[in-house]
Regions:
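Transmembrane alpha-helix/helix-exit interface in multi-pass inner-membrane proteins
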Residues: 87-110, 132, 136-140, 144
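Membrane-embedded alpha-helical bundles of multi-pass transporters/translocases
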Residues: 123, 127, 131, 135, ...
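Membrane interface segments of multi-pass transport proteins and intramembrane proteases
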Residues: 150-162
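Hydrophobic transmembrane alpha-helices
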Residues: 1-73, 80, 90
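Membrane-interface interhelical connector segments
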Residues: 102-127
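Transmembrane helix-bundle signature of multi-pass membrane transporters/permeases
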Residues: 39, 89-90, 133, 137, ...
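A structural feature that tracks compact, well-ordered secondary-structure segments
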Residues: 168, 176-185
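Hydrophobic alpha-helical transmembrane segments
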Residues: 8, 31-32, 61, 86, ...
């Protein structure tokens, strides 16, 4: 099975799972999804794959689903709920390397076989961790703000696609630029640096455009009383 086909399958699985979290757990399900997706995406990003002829990291699809989760909260609930979800994701993102770094400080036993693998996955690279954290918090809060700004200018279900795509496409660009600049600028030739920015953004932008039916489904579930709030 090709990586490209797997990418589309993963997209459908991730975004469908997000809707199931929402349908059966309501608003709390979206909060849980943001925390879970943030942690898993930051583990997946360690793996580099070839996708559509370019090198890319895993985690882009799951990371993009976080923006859909906050968009659903912005659309069906309040700006405060969306901002809270973004903050939950940020805390999860920061907690993961901190807690795993502490775990790695323990001296492994004679029969241990996991230390090297854990070091590979969770060994802290300050620029990468810092870049991820700054990019996440800036892009997420911009996403929440811009969604509500567009909603105030273009309300109504017919403009839902514009609110979702308009806010996310700009926010994902901010995310890609900030992360790549902090994590990689000066480490690679200028051409390679911009290739990283471009390919990362294009994958995230593709997810943003493809997730439009999912936010309409989330709106339908909410307005027709199919969401089980906890």
């Amino acid at each position: 099975m090709s990586n490209e086909l797997l990418w589309f399958i993963v997209f459908l699985v991730d975004f469908s799972a997000l809707l199931l979290f929402y349908k059966f757990l309501g608003k709390l399900g979206l909060f849980a999804w943001v925390a879970m997706a943030t942690v898993i995406a930051n583990i997946q990003v360690v793996k580099v794959i070839s996708l559509f002829g370019v090198s890319a990291t895993l985690g882009n699809v799951l990371y993009a689903s976080i923006f859909l989760a906050t968009a659903i909260l912005s659309e069906n609930y309040t700006k405060r709920d969306a901002a809270l979800a973004a903050l939950i994701g940020f805390v999860s993102m920061v907690a993961l390397p901190v807690l795993m770094t502490l775990s790695l400080l323990f001296k492994p036993g004679a029969d241990d076989f996991s230390q090297e693998a854990l070091q590979t996955l969770f060994g802290v690279v300050p620029r990468v961790v810092g870049g991820s954290a700054v990019a996440y918090i800036v892009s997420q809060f911009h996403d929440v703000w811009s969604y509500h700004f567009i909603k105030s200018k273009k309300p109504g279900t017919k403009m839902l696609w514009l609110r979702n795509n308009g806010s996310t496409l700009v926010s994902q660009l901010l995310d890609s630029l900030i992360f790549a600049t902090i994590a990689f600028y000066g480490l690679y030739p200028t051409r390679v640096f911009w290739e990283i920015v471009l390919t990362t953004y294009l994958l995230k932008a593709a997810c943003a455009l493809l997730d439009t039916p999912f936010i309409y489904l989330a709106k339908y579930l909410y307005t027709h009383g199919h969401v089980r709030e906890r």
